[in-house]
Amino acid sequence: MSIKFFLLVSRQGKVRLAKWFNTLSIKERAKIIRDVSSLVITRKPKMCNFVEYKGEKIVYRRYASLFFVCGIEQDDNELIILEVIHKFVECLDKYFGNVCELDLIFNFEKAYYVMEELLLAGELQESSKTNVLSAVLAGDAESEADAQQDSLQKLVGSVKKR
């Protein structure tokens, strides 16, 4: 099982998050985003969550106003990818507390961090939500401590200049 790309697309077609696990040119990425987002957005809610696209499978799931889209190889299991998408949404939900599109817009780096704790090179790295969230929260605490130390050093530096 190897995910080639992971996209979060709004109903209006705006990309909110894009993670690529294969090397592609910017033109190729833009074409894939354009094609896949228009393909997924236009589908009716009762339709299947799997679509074929240029020899690959597109697996998607809609949560509220966002489409979570994964591109996978033809022989990969779609149901496992749906579970990976669901696990990612659950982690985001726990981290942000009922995640919404605005959380992802204004805190996209945190969403990427959650994704990177969950997936590694397109493979599921950690299946435990607790472990993913504890790693993310530990990273938050560390960056907060660094920010406090930096502000303290700036304060001490400004006092010394006086």
UniProtKB/Swiss-Prot annotation:
GO cellular component, one term: intracellular membrane-bounded organelle
GO terms of biological process kind: endosome to plasma membrane protein transport; retrograde transport, endosome to Golgi; vesicle-mediated transport
Record-level Gene Ontology MF annotations: clathrin adaptor activity; clathrin binding
InterPro entries documented for this protein: AP1_sigma (IPR044733), AP_complex_ssu (IPR016635), AP_mu_sigma_su (IPR022775), Longin-like_dom_sf (IPR011012)
Highest taxon of source: Eukaryota
A family per Pfam: Clat_adaptor_s
SUPFAM superfamilies: SNARE-like
Keyword line: Cytoplasm, Cytoplasmic vesicle, Endosome, Golgi apparatus, Membrane, Nucleus, Protein transport, Transport
Major location (coarse): cytoplasm
Compartment list: Cytoplasm; Nucleus; Cytoplasmic vesicle, Clathrin-coated vesicle membrane; Endosome
Gene ablation phenotype (knockout): Leads to hypersensitivity to valproic acid.
Function: Component of the AP-1 complex which links clathrin to receptors in coated vesicles. Clathrin-associated protein complexes are believed to interact with the cytoplasmic tails of membrane proteins, leading to their selection and concentration.
Assembly information from the UniProt record: Adaptor protein complex 1 (AP-1) is a heterotetramer composed of two large adaptins (gamma-type subunit apl4 and beta-type subunit apl2), a medium adaptin (mu-type subunit apm1) and a small adaptin (sigma-type subunit aps1). AP-1 interacts with clathrin.
Stated family: Belongs to the adaptor complexes small subunit family.
Name of protein: AP-1 complex subunit sigma-1
Source organism phylogeny: Eukaryota, Fungi, Dikarya, Ascomycota, Taphrinomycotina
